[in-house]
Each structure stands twice: as structure tokens, then as C-alpha cells.
Curated annotation (Swiss-Prot):
Gene for this chain: rpl14
Species for this entry: Cuscuta obtusiflora (Peruvian dodder)
Name of the molecule in the record: Large ribosomal subunit protein uL14c
Function: Binds to 23S rRNA.
Lineage of source species: Eukaryota, Viridiplantae, Streptophyta, Embryophyta, Tracheophyta
GO MF annotations in UniProt: large ribosomal subunit rRNA binding; structural constituent of ribosome
UniProt keyword Glycoprotein present: no
């Protein structure tokens, strides 16, 4: 469960290393975000000489959470970290590579470009 002020790792090569959630896109008073939700975040740590810089406000989709994800068939997914992929206004990733495993629930939410770039889909 991701809420405001939560720090997340960035799972792509867009230039950001860590981001902090400042808003959850959706309802006006939504408290928590889960896998597949879009958040507004600020970059807290970035790689030097890249397009994204520290303190820049971006949109990101959550791809991994430490809170377990329960599927209809009884399988429970839990990851070691909270991670997100930075996206643009159309929902396409800003980076060209995705690091780490991605859940298949993102395909149902029309993040097909992220799923196709991922090395492993669980």
C-alpha cells in the first residue's frame, strides 16, 4: 500500500533512482495506491547528466509493492521493495528498459508497453 510521502525505487532507466509519492490519481480523497495505480511523485535521487533531475514532478505507475497482492486463483504475490515506472501523459514509459519482475495485472490495465519491456512477468 502506497500513500503520500512513501519513497519508491524506480524500476526503469529514465534517470531517476528514487521518487516520493505526493498524490494518488483517482478519487479526491483516495488514501492508498496498489499495483497498477498511477501516482504523482517528486524525484528524490537522480543519476547525473540524464533528462530527469532531482525535485522534478512526474507521473508513475506502481509495479511492485511489499504489501501482498491476492489473485482470484489463491496465489499471493509479495515483492521485496516498492517500485514504480515513470510514465508520460499517454501512459508510455519514459525509459527504454524495465528492471525486475512485473505482475501480469498491468496487462489488464493497458500498460502493454511496460509489460513488453519487462524481463519477467509473474
Amino acid at each position: 500500500m502506497i500513500q503520500s510521502q512513501t519513497h519508491l525505487n524506480v524500476a526503469d532507466n529514465s534517470g531517476a533512482r528514487t521518487i516520493m509519492c505526493i498524490r494518488i490519481i483517482g478519487s479526491s480523497n483516495r488514501r492508498y495506491a496498489h499495483i497498477g495505480d498511477i501516482i504523482v511523485a517528486v524525484i528524490k535521487d537522480a543519476v547525473p547528466n540524464m533528462t530527469l533531475e532531482k525535485s522534478e514532478v512526474v507521473r508513475a505507475v506502481i509495479v511492485r509493492t511489499r504489501k501482498e497482492l491476492k489473485r482470484d486463483n489463491g496465489i499471493i504475490l509479495r515483492y521485496d521493495d516498492n517500485a514504480a515506472v515513470i510514465i508520460d501523459k499517454e501512459g508510455n514509459p519514459k525509459g527504454t528498459r524495465i528492471f525486475g519482475a512485473i505482475p501480469r495485472e498491468l496487462r489488464k490495465l493497458n500498460f502493454n508497453k511496460i509489460v513488453s519491456l519487462a524481463p519477467e512477468v509473474l
